[in-house]
A protein has these predicted regions:
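N-terminal carbohydrate-binding/catalytic regions of secreted carbohydrate-active enzymes
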Residues: 27-100
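Active-site clefts of carbohydrate-active enzymes
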Residues: 139, 145-149, 194-222, 241-259
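Aromatic- and acid-rich polysaccharide-binding/catalytic face
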Residues: 54, 75, 104, 154-209, ...
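Extracytoplasmic
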Residues: 281-429, 468
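C-terminal tail/sorting-segment detector
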Residues: 434, 488-509
Length: 509
């Protein structure tokens, strides 16, 4: 776990004057929720989602006037006993309505519970209603069933389509709770291949049977699945299951923090990630003057997202885990060939509790193939605090034009506790050497204080024992940090200057 110094600077000029960048809201992304009753619930969800449904013909009365073109409600004929007049009335008052969802899990006994034959017999009336209202029609939503009239979703659909024909609906709806991209992709690929219809994934989250799912596991699978769903041309729309529910106990899918009564609502950690993830627009290229949130990548591998505490980050979320082999690809439009400085805003936990991160910068093509190394792998230190941010700079030479740039983990070890909040470019390629090393600063215990010596003016310091426990921290005054009551032994000291440069020192008491 040897460490090589890298440049850690104060907030760069690019962050001070750069244009803030935030991605557009995804047309695809939606939520399912049968218990929306408050405007405040809608307000926190609609910031990053475009549609919702409740499994009902119309929204609940308390929110029936809230849907609009920016956050549309999609009515559903849950089974054959729907109220066509209610749907007509809603569509008349909400001309933004464009779609009608068909039967919900007809191959489940405790859902619509319809044989393919029964569903086919009731389908012409649903078709007629959709045609009358000028709505695109989404076929019945199916999944694997433990008890239905036809357990296998492919068999149920084959029999249904054999009776009504492929032209009886515009899209196919499915549900998937596998928790992984592979199982989801397999199901989507198969249905799309069979019928050539784009997919509405109207229920999904990580809920594989009776397995325990932690909030962290739910977010990890969400991040990978949303990226796949946004980028797949086979997927027309998707909806998370569901907006309200437990956020701490399995399956921990809730997007809104549970709260009784009226009043403002807030997103759970799961909700912050789902609502604020990128729309993965492959046609959008950032300018070199933007402050780009780290979550605005267009391609990634084995990373996790979570809340950001960086005031310089335009997004409320950031990369919170960069696993071994992880990477994130970003699109930039470079105005002129030349030397540039790439600045990453980072925080997180490093040694002695985690391996310090190693990061390299690469040029990649649109298929993700690495074309060239822009900056070699370097290991750098972290502040051992997820809410203290520093600038890490890389000097790179770029060609002019639109291109993809990859930020990639290069370390042989996992885990690294790095967080990445945002990134910027400066068009000069200069990197100011503000690294602290042991030639510039040293420290030793002097009674109940930790005394600093050297050329660097230390502003704050944190002291850890060899188990990684924080035992002292605070401002350094008169080159000394109060460190009372510490037993004799070896300690690790993280020292930071007022400009944001940092180093880790080992000291014996």
């Amino acid at each position: 776990m040897n460490k090589n110094n890298i440049i850690l600077t104060a907030t760069s000029l690019a962050l001070a004057i750069g244009v803030l960048s935030a991605g557009a809201k995804s047309f695809k992304r939606g939520v399912s929720e049968n218990a929306f009753n408050l405007k405040e619930e809608i307000d926190v969800i609609k910031t990053g989602t475009s549609w919702f449904y409740t499994w009902g013909n119309v929204p609940n009365n308390n929110i029936k006037d809230l849907p609009d073109a920016d956050f549309e409600f999609v009515p559903m004929c849950w089974n054959a006993n729907y109220n066509a007049d209610n749907i007509r009335s809603y569509c008349k008052s909400h001309p933004e309505t464009k779609y009608l969802l068909g039967f919900n899990e007809p191959n489940f006994k405790n859902q619509a519970n319809m044989t393919p034959e029964a569903a086919a017999a009731a389908w012409p009336a649903v078709q007629a209603l959709a045609k009358e209202l000028g709505l695109k029609l989404v076929g019945p939503a199916v999944n694997y069933s433990p008890d239905g009239p036809e357990n296998d979703p492919y068999t149920w659909y084959a029999k249904f389509v054999n009776l009504v024909g492929k032209d009886a609906f515009d899209y196919i709806a499915i549900h998937n709770y596998s928790g992984g991209v592979d199982g989801m992709r397999t199901m989507i690929d198969k249905f799309y291949g069979l019928y050539g219809k784009q997919i509405w994934l109207t229920e999904f989250c990580n809920w594989p049977g009776n397995n325990t799912v932690t909030p962290e596991a739910q977010i990890t699978s969400m991040v990978a699945q949303v990226e796949y769903l946004e980028k797949s041309e086979k997927v027309y729309r998707y909806a998370w299951f569901k907006a309200k529910g437990s956020i701490t106990t399995s399956p921990a899918y809730g997007l809104i923090v549970p709260k009784n009564g009226v009043g403002e609502r807030e997103l759970s950690e799961q909700g912050k990630v789902y609502v604020n993830m990128s729309d993965f627009d492959q046609t959008r290229y950032h300018s070199m003057t933007e402050v780009v949130p780290a979550v605005e990548y267009v391609n990634s591998n084995t990373l996790v997202l979570g809340s950001s505490f960086d005031g310089k980050n335009p997004s409320p979320i950031e990369i919170t885990k960069f696993n071994s082999g992880a990477y994130a690809d970003y699109q930039f439009d470079v105005p002129a060939a030349g030397s540039y400085t790439l600045t990453l805003r980072v925080s997180g936990m490093g040694e002695p509790t985690r391996f310090d991160p190693t990061v390299g910068i690469y040029s990649v093509d649109n298929d993700g193939k690495e074309l060239s190394t822009l900056a070699d792998n370097r290991q750098f230190q972290l502040p051992n605090d997820n809410q203290s941010y520093f600038d890490v700079q890389f000097a790179v030479s770029l060609a002019a034009g639109k291109q993809r740039i990859r930020v990639k983990d290069g370390g042989p070890y996992s885990p690294s506790g790095i967080h990445i909040s945002c990134l910027t470019f400066n068009p000069n390629g200069s990197v100011s050497d503000m690294t602290i090393d042991t030639e510039k600063v040293a420290c030793h215990f002097a009674g109940e204080c930790l005394q600093f010596t050297g050329n660097a003016a230390i502003g704050t310091a944190s002291v850890y024992d060899l188990n990684g426990r924080l035992v002292a921290s605070g401002e350094v005054e008169g080159n000394a940090l109060a460190a009372e009551g510490l037993a004799d032994g070896v300690y690790v000291v993280k020292a930071v200057t007022a400009e944001g440069a940092a180093t880790t020192l080992k000291v014996v008491k």
